[in-house]
Amino acid sequence: MVWIQRRRLLASCLCITATVFLLVTLQVVVELGKFERKKFKNSDLRAGHAKMEEEPVHLYPLPGKEALILKRKNQLETDSYPIMLWWSPLTGETGRLGQCGADECFFTINRTYLHHPMTKAFLFYGTDFNIDSLPLPRKAHHDWALFHEESPKNNYKLFHKPVITLFNYTATFSRHSHLPLTTQYLEGVEVLKSLRYLVPLRSKNNLRRRLAPLVYIQSDCDPPSDRDSYVRELMTYIEVDSYGECLRNKDLPQQLKNPASMDADGFYRIIAQYKFILAFENAVCDDYITEKFWRPLKLGVVPVYYGSPSIADWLPSNRSAILVSEFAHPRELANYIRQLDHDDRMYEAYIEWKLKGEVSNQRLLTALRERKWGVQDVHQDNYIDAFECMVCTKVWDNIRLQEKGLPPKRWKADVSHLSCPEPAVFAFSPLAPRWSSLREMWIPSFEQSKKEAQALRWLVDRNKNFSAQEFWALVFKD
């Protein structure tokens, strides 16, 4: 009997304890709810909308670039801010309210905002731009913006008038773009003036006992510029040390063989020992200038440059690079380099600007001073941020015009924003190789891209969704 009474007493205690626990839990939930409502009420979004708590940072590595550190927010319902919808998942942003000067826009990759009344612009990354899915039908207030800093070989159809003129705003390597990225691989004028890696000419002359006068470092072989064909021919007239996968005849130390090490101090020290470096781009386009040009200038090595036809507009000084386009044949170029190699005074004329720390090109200085973004600079926006804000600001400019009863300003890209001629074969060799990537791949690809551009434009102008089958049927239509 005593045992039964004890069990009843224990059960009663457990019930009382459970009741107290539930009451305390309920009170905590109520208090938390009050706190969340207070936080919601005091958020800084205008028109009473909620600013959600930030999640941990999201890293998105850009091709060939330093990873961008990007924040994202959970979700935001808004009818007060223009929505900038990234149609390419470049940033990974699920939702972020961005400040662009006095303007604010909501940036997202969430395609559920496609039909939202405040969606004003669609942002595309050129390499990812394809026909599989486009935001159609396109409404009158829908702006399209293109970000494309890379080689045309990544997406040739963008470089034809029918496609490039689909976009209202651009950020490309061209100086004519709405946001020029021509100097995207140059940190600033100070790195050009720096003597940190400069090897004295006397030392370079001594090093010539074991090093060639020229160095070539490429691992992207047989690109549209056909640079390997030129260098292969040049090698028959002058010695070239070739690292990398293309025409390799010399090995880097094991720790420097990874492409990621091409900005390593050890790699710089090796390359800086040479007198000349073959700086050949993978494509020939106006203002398409990569690290292949800027790196030797930073190291105190004379670049032997082939690529942008407009490169003379971007030289630090009038005599700071040897331009391949000024020589009719690789043999002539080899003879000139050999002459400089044996004449210190002639050679020093190409590095005099470096020794004096004088960058005289006003176009280059102005471009560096006025650009709205930085390279590897934590104190400046990166060029993705600058692109987003350019579009945001232009959208707001039109909103303000319409609020005044004025028509919006219509922006439109043109072919100068991505100017690349058809890939061409070098005419120096009378005997063509049995197989050439240029003849067999890049020239046919360029020709087909013309048809793709025309087909895409016709389908987009029709302003309704289309299938891949419809697209390719138009491309290959007789």
UniProtKB/Swiss-Prot annotation:
Pathway: Protein modification; protein glycosylation. Disulfide bonds join C389-C392. It is an enzyme of class 2 (transferase). Residues 1-8 are cytoplasmic. It comes from the Eukaryota. The chain crosses the membrane at residues 9-31. Its EC number is 2.4.1.221, 2.4.1.-. It catalyses: L-threonyl-[protein] + GDP-beta-L-fucose = 3-O-(alpha-L-fucosyl)-L-threonyl-[protein] + GDP + H(+); L-seryl-[protein] + GDP-beta-L-fucose = 3-O-(alpha-L-fucosyl)-L-seryl-[protein] + GDP + H(+). It is found in: Endoplasmic reticulum membrane. SUPFAM superfamilies: UDP-Glycosyltransferase/glycogen phosphorylase (SSF53756). It is a single-pass type II membrane protein. Residues 32-478 are lumenal. InterPro entries: Alpha-1_3-FUT_met, Glyco_tran_10_C, Glyco_tran_10_N, Glyco_trans_10, GT10-like_C_sf. Belongs to the glycosyltransferase 10 family. Protein O-fucosyltransferase that specifically catalyzes O-fucosylation of serine or threonine residues in EMI domains of target proteins, such as MMRN1, MMRN2 and EMID1. Attaches fucose through an O-glycosidic linkage. O-fucosylation of EMI domain-containing proteins may be required for facilitating protein folding and secretion. May also show alpha-(1,3)-fucosyltransferase activity toward the innermost N-acetyl glucosamine (GlcNAc) residue in biantennary N-glycan acceptors. However, this was tested with a library of synthetic substrates and this activity is unsure in vivo. This is GDP-fucose protein O-fucosyltransferase 3. It comes from Canis lupus familiaris. The lineage of its organism: Eukaryota, Metazoa, Chordata, Craniata, Vertebrata. The gene is FUT10.
